[in-house]
Amino acid sequence: MTFTSAIKQCYHKAFTLRGRASRSEYWFFCLYLLILCFVLVTIMVFMDSNLQDDDSGLVPNLMGLSILLSGLALFIHIVPMFSVTLRRLHDGNMPGWLLLLSIIPVGNLILFIFMLLPSTPGDNPYGPNPHDEEKKEYEWEQQ
């Protein structure tokens, strides 16, 4: 799975809580969100440092706008991230309720380890192996 296809699939399956997500789909989407956060923070720092000496009152308005847009971007990506994490747990043949581990501090470390685990080979109760589907798509594209 490529970087762009993983992002497209995460948005396409944002409200799909069934099925499985491969490691590449999950980690490419995490990388995309990390890049997005980096860009948003860079814009906010740039605006703060370049407009600090402005006495027009524009700076608080622009900072407020950038904080609002950053919050909106975060809000928009909560559902796809929740969905792909749940489907990633399914890929390891684990129930989705394990996502609730993120509520406790050490639970995030446990979830991180679960996200690193390889897929369950073959089909499991949550659906077919996503690697098999990726191989079929790749073979079809090569023809």
Q: What spans do the regions from the language model cover?
A:
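Membrane-helix interface segments in multi-pass membrane proteins
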Residues: 37-78, 142-143
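Selective recognition of hydrophobic, aromatic-rich stretches within alpha-helical transmembrane segments
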Residues: 1-4, 58-83, 95-117
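A generic structural signal for secondary-structure junctions
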Residues: 44, 48, 105, 114-117, ...
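Membrane-interface extramembranous regions at the lipid-water interface
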Residues: 1-32, 81-97, 114-143
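Solvent-exposed loop/turn segments at secondary-structure junctions
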Residues: 33-34, 105-108, 133
